[in-house]
């Protein structure tokens, strides 16, 4: 941050941890930070962890953030806040956005949950502050990158429509073993959710839905073979924003070969379950270990014909590894999710944006060259 702000972080998990540490360590002017969590001791542990891990002087405090209702302490914290950064599970997003609106704070979140996002869009229509939604890795950075590629392609080749826009992200372990070829590097419920809920795509220039895990493909990125398949949430609002401009567009999740076949077998075993997300989560957690050393693989490409009808393609691929921040090494999933949220926060705090701001509405060039984005993602 370039000037002093008071920033409230809701949550005390791995992403909240990264957001707090990066804010303390990388801000030009260190903000005042409040950490709120339903388990106060977890918020207090995070405060101590940041204080011990940053090389900068930082004012950071914990408070008890209730799941239901509010307290006088919460009210006092919210009245001081300039922005609320929501790192809680997506089901809590409408409630957190409600607090932001009530106390005239800006708000930014990470969730890929579509229904909750629609609730917030309705709530924030007439807000006096700005609400940037779905601003993590996927949805988030990958959508801004894809939109940037689309805009650059249209400008370079003097066209206003393209054939395909594809963007893919994998939060992966460095190694993978049979039979599942996977290791959890982030929330198991998030993985299960994106495998079960439908994906929003563009087909024949129109927004539509497709079942997740229904269009598997093989792709080679930097010489390594992956599988990619449709999953929910990662496309953000691009299916709405680019309908009529892109013939075929989708977001897919990258995995090592063999993983999706294993997942499909588990889903078939639980086909009678009335709670398929919980059933798949339980099945995966029984067999798949959590992995500490991770990597993020991302790929985006746009393809279409130029003015002479020659087929052209532009693409970006990146591998992002764990990174030292202050005295700690953060996992790749932490940094890649945290910095788009922080970059969006800086945008809200240092401009006059109001109401809902979706991923397609962000200025792609300034976002992708942002002072928090570049140290993690590099230049485009």
Q: Model features per residue range: what roles?
A:
Residues 7-13:
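Conserved N-terminal Rossmann-fold NAD(P)-binding element of oxidoreductases
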Residues 16-17:
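N-terminal Rossmann-fold NAD(P) dinucleotide-binding loop
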Residues 38-42, 114:
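Helix N-cap at the beta1-alpha1 junction of Rossmann-like dinucleotide-binding domains, i.e.
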Residues 53-69:
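Rossmann-fold cofactor-recognition segment
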Residues 66-79:
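Conserved Rossmann-fold cofactor-binding substructure of NAD(P)-dependent oxidoreductases
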Residues 87-89, 99-117:
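ADP-ribose/adenylate-binding Rossmann-like module
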Residues 110-131:
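Rossmann-fold NAD(P)-binding glycine/threonine-rich loop
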Residues 152-380:
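C-terminal catalytic/substrate-binding lobe primarily of soluble NAD(P)-dependent oxidoreductases
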């Amino acid at each position: 941050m370039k000037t002093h702000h008071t920033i409230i972080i809701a949550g005390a998990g791995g992403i909240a941890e990264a957001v707090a540490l990066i804010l303390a360590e990388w801000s030009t002017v260190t903000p005042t930070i409040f950490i709120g969590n339903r388990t106060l001791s977890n918020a207090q542990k995070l405060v101590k962890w940041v204080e011990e891990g940053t090389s900068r002087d930082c004012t950071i405090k914990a408070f008890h953030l209730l799941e239901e209702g509010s307290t006088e302490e919460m009210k006092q914290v919210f009245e001081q806040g300039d922005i609320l950064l929501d790192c809680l599970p997506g089901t809590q997003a409408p409630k957190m956005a409600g607090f932001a609106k009530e106390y005239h704070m800006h708000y930014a979140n990470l969730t890929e949950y579509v229904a909750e996002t629609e609730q917030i869009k309705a709530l924030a229509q007439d807000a006096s502050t700005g609400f940037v939604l779905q601003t993590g890795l996927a949805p988030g950075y990958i959508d801004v990158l894809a939109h940037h590629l689309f805009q650059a392609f249209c400008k370079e080749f003097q066209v206003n429509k393209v054939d395909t826009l594809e963007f893919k992200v994998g939060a992966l372990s460095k190694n993978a073993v049979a039979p599942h070829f996977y290791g959890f590097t982030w929330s198991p419920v998030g993985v299960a959710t994106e495998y079960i809920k439908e994906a929003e795509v563009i087909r024949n220039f129109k927004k539509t839905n497709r079942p997740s895990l229904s269009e598997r493909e093989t792709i080679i990125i930097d010489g390594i073979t992956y599988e990619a398949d449709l999953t929910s949430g990662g496309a953000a609002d691009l299916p709405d924003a680019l309908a009529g401009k892109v013939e075929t567009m989708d977001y897919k999740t990258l995995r090592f070969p063999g993983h999706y076949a294993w997942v499909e077998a588990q889903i078939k075993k639980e086909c009678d379950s009335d709670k398929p997300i919980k059933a798949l989560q339980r099945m995966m957690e029984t067999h798949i270990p959590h992995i500490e050393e991770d990597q993020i693989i991302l790929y985006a490409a746009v393809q279409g014909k130029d003015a002479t009808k020659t087929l052209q393609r532009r693409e970006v691929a990146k591998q992002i590894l764990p990174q030292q921040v202050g005295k700690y090494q953060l996992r790749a999933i932490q940094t890649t999710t945290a910095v788009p949220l922080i970059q969006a926060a800086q945008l809200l705090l240092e401009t006059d944006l109001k109401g809902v701001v979706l991923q397609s509405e962000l200025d792609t060039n300034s976002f992708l060259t942002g002072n928090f984005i570049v140290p993690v993602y590099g230049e485009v």
